[in-house]
Amino acid sequence: MTIYLPELIPSHSTVFPNIENALNNPDGLLIMGGDLSSAQLISAYQHGIFPWYSDGDPILWWSPSVRGVFFPEQFSPSKSLKKFFRKSNYNVTLNKATYQVIDLCASTRPKEETWIMPEMIKAYKTLVDLGYCHSVEVWNDNELIGGLYGLQIGQVFCGESMFSLQTNASKIALWKFCEHFVSSNGKLIDCQMMNPHLESLGAQEMKRSDFKTLLEELHVKPTSSDCYLAQTLGGSSFS
């Protein structure tokens, strides 16, 4: 099957087409080309677009017809997860080891399954330095055992990836971040594409048009000023 895609013009690389112009097959593919500069990535996320491509492919930009999202105030951990956390030695932090979280999200996946290639790692670490990319870490004593990272776009957190090296670590990262995000006036967590794991955690499907409308409203509204300061989000001893 031949696919004809528009290509980002280098001199206008932060200008994306309307996401309603994305293809139906493959679902959500919008445009190719450009680069992973900070300006281009921030513009993409502000418009509900994200990069996703394989090694050797051009950069492909997506906005699927159905989005996976969390409304953090609705996130409800199971009784078993709460009990597990209370009995564990886990502690949860925010922005204490973002570079490490990005590296582990990439390295803990089979090579053929990861889209987090060296150029993407470099690009998102640059966004860390600029204050746009943030992480949640889960520790067992001093060992980093799970976490997630993503971008802040106003009152929206655009989740990129998560990893878990020990039982329930990524679930606890998401739970504690939802609690913190709500208290900081955060409204929406974008998961990009729905999958069974996210659905099992309570993610909901949202049509692209509805997501676009909500994103346009929320991306210009701020969270509280201390939302992304490096801090502890909770430990099993005081959960």
UniProtKB/Swiss-Prot annotation:
Name of the protein: Leucyl/phenylalanyl-tRNA--protein transferase
Domain of life where this protein originates: Bacteria
Cellular component GO terms held in the UniProt record: cytoplasm
Any Pfam family matching the protein: Leu_Phe_trans
Species for this entry: Aliivibrio fischeri (strain MJ11)
Catalytic activity: N-terminal L-lysyl-[protein] + L-leucyl-tRNA(Leu) = N-terminal L-leucyl-L-lysyl-[protein] + tRNA(Leu) + H(+); N-terminal L-arginyl-[protein] + L-leucyl-tRNA(Leu) = N-terminal L-leucyl-L-arginyl-[protein] + tRNA(Leu) + H(+); L-phenylalanyl-tRNA(Phe) + an N-terminal L-alpha-aminoacyl-[protein] = an N-terminal L-phenylalanyl-L-alpha-aminoacyl-[protein] + tRNA(Phe)
Family annotation (SUPFAM superfamilies): Acyl-CoA N-acyltransferases (Nat)
Localization per Swiss-Prot or TrEMBL: Cytoplasm
EC class of the enzyme, as a word: transferase
NCBIfam families the UniProt entry points to: aat
